[in-house]
């Protein structure tokens, strides 16, 4: 006979999740694998001759790249000789300023920085993250996708997402050839919601770069790097080829970051018996070595792997912290869904939500998860109210704000009509008034009428083949009566020429002002310092629609 208690527990959502015991030989260990190398460095005449237990003759491609470009050699031997526990204390001590820590962390080897953070529990890591993130002001990024690649819905959802507070928005495709329409719809909708929101369309790398060069996106993120050489070469890549791609984006005025995440090498079968965190540290150093301003990490689409082993969610926070400690922008994931448990997914979110990161999620699904073409997110559109209440309960700025239904309806309608004008002005397949009406009130693609997919794809490919650029979109908006949106779209193109938003951790806020690690320096040094939720922003977060006003009762 079974215990009734255990029968009830067996039905709990968390017991639908997958868990696995550590399997060190295959890399199923989050942190502190016995196979991880001991920290070491030897430098002869300015050249690294030993790195983390390997002599130069044993270096793989990643070791060579990191040794040449990724470590501040001027202080490396000094820092490597320091006690790792002392360094861990310095990281989480608010009395030790960020500007004094970065010269030390950037002089460590991958094995050394992993050893340092391994001495820290999650509360200490969050204390460190609060101080070490590059930009003073935390922010949020959204996914805006749908299973039908419906551009009208993307425009409306993007407008709502921007209105709710997302500073970056990302789309991808169900059908690859739809990409130009998705990119244009996302950018138009985002500028309707809030001028200055940055957008990207995640695709294979050649098409993604092409769309950026045509002016249909503002940044790139999904340029993946890996922690073992076989995973790189399996994809016909090297750290050098990724660095070249990064420079291609930056030279065209497009912000970009790399993407990595613990567990990717395990998934590919090339973990070499090392811990997930150690391999991820190598990815972070590759990013630094390539001269890239930031990184999306935190396991991202591989989250099912670290979350299945002990200390896995702690390791995810640790990799975010290492990223910030190397003076990089950190888009800290809270991305792909990994659990059936609401309690567990909230705990995973709080690791980044509470201290704040450059982008707490990368991204938060601004659509219901059934429409999320990134395989679902840890948080989706049905969590907006919960998220706003969390901000209010804890007095934490998570990047979003409460909104009114009538405002959202109006902004969605304007975005759909603006895209209708773009399609008409560019001679693309027409958007009907019925579609505009549906997108205005839709929750997801189940609420949208069908489009002629064959016709859409044909014209979407013409965008690429005929090099139809962002200025054509601006012109169509102006001719269609949306002069304000046209100006905002033009301003986004101008931003690529000035280049200010290529700085570390840059976002564009009101009136085209760029906030970055250059002019919004994180100056946290304990209580009453650093970013504080106060003034108009706190009033905005407090004012949730469901709060009763005592003056109106009775």
Curated annotation (Swiss-Prot):
Keywords, alphabetical: Bacterial microcompartment, Cobalamin, Cobalt, Lyase
Keyword Lyase tagged: yes
Disulphide bonds in the chain: none
Pathway: Polyol metabolism; 1,2-propanediol degradation
Keyword Lyase (UniProt): yes
Record's subcellular location: Bacterial microcompartment
GO biological process terms held by the UniProt record: propanediol catabolic process
Cofactor: adenosylcob(III)alamin
Gene Ontology cellular component list: bacterial microcompartment
EC number in record: 4.2.1.28
Annotated catalysed reactions: propane-1,2-diol = propanal + H2O
InterPro entries (UniProt xref): Cbl-dep_enz_cat, Diol/glycerol_deHase_lsu_sf, Diol/glycerol_deHydtase_lsu
GO molecular function, one term: cobalamin binding
Self-association state and partner proteins as the record states: The propanediol dehydratase enzyme is a heterotrimeric complex composed of a large (PduC), a medium (PduD) and a small (PduE) subunit.
Family according to the record: Belongs to the diol/glycerol dehydratase large subunit family.
Role, per record: Part of the PduCDE complex that catalyzes the dehydration of 1,2-propanediol (1,2-PD) to propionaldehyde. This subunit is directly targeted to the bacterial microcompartment (BMC).
Name under which the protein is recorded: Propanediol dehydratase large subunit
GN (gene name): pduC
């Amino acid at each position: 006979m079974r215990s009734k208690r255990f029968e009830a527990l067996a039905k709990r959502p968390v017991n639908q999740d997958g868990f696995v015991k550590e399997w060190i030989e295959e890399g199923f260990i989050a942190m502190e694998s016995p196979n991880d190398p001991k920290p070491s460095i030897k430098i002869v005449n300015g050249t690294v001759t030993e790195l983390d237990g390997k002599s130069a003759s044993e270096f793989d491609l990643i070791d060579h790249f990191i040794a040449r470009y990724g470590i501040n050699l001027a202080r490396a031997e000094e820092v490597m000789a320091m006690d790792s526990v002392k360094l861990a204390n310095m990281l989480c001590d608010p009395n030790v300023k960020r500007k004094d820590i970065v010269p030390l962390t950037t002089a460590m080897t991958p094995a050394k920085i992993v050893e340092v953070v391994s001495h820290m529990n999650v509360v200490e890591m969050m204390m460190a993250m609060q101080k070490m993130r590059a930009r003073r002001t935390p922010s949020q990024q959204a996914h805006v996708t749908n299973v039908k690649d419906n551009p009208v819905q993307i425009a409306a959802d993007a407008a709502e997402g921007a209105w709710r507070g997302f500073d970056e928005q990302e789309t991808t495709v169900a059908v690859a050839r739809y990409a130009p329409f998705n990119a244009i719809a996302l950018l138009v909708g985002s500028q309707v919601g809030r001028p200055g929101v940055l957008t990207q369309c995640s695709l294979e790398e050649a098409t993604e770069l092409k769309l950026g060069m045509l002016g249909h996106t503002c940044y790139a993120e999904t340029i993946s790097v890996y922690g073992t050489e076989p995973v790189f070469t399996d994809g016909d890549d090297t750290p050098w080829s990724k660095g070249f791609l990064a420079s291609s984006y930056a030279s065209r005025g497009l912000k970009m970051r790399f993407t990595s995440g613990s567990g990717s090498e395990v998934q590919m079968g090339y973990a070499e018996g090392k811990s997930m965190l150690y391999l991820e540290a190598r990815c972070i150093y590759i990013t630094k070595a390539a001269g890239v301003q930031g990184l999306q990490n935190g396991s991202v689409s591989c989250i099912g792997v670290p979350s299945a082993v002990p200390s896995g969610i702690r390791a995810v926070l640790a990799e975010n912290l290492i990223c910030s400690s190397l003076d990089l922008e950190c888009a800290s994931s809270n991305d792909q869904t990994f659990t059936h448990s609401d309690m567990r997914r909230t705990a995973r979110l709080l690791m980044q939500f509470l201290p704040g990161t450059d982008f707490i999620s990368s991204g938060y699904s601004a659509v219901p998860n059934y429409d999320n073409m990134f395989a679902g997110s840890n948080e989706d559109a049905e969590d907006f109210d919960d998220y706003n209440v969390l901000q209010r309960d804890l007095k934490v700025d998570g990047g979003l704000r409460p909104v009114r239904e009538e405002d959202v309806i109006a902004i969605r309608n304007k975005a759909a009509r603006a895209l209708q004008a773009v399609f008409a002005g560019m001679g693309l397949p027409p958007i009907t008034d019925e579609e505009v009406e549906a997108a205005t009130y839709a929750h997801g693609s189940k609420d949208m009428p069908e489009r002629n997919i064959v016709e859409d794809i044909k014209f979407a490919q013409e965008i690429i083949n005929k090099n139809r650029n962002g200025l054509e979109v601006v012109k169509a908006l102006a001719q269609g009566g949306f002069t304000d949106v046209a100006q905002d779209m033009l301003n986004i193109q101008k931003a690529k020429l000035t280049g200010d938003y290529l700085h570390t951790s840059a976002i564009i806020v009101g009136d085209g002002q760029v906030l970055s690690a250059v002019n919004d320096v994180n100056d946290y040094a304990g209580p009453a310092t650093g970013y504080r939720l106060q003034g108009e922003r706190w009033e905005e977060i407090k004012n949730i629609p469901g709060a009763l006003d005592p003056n109106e009762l009775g």
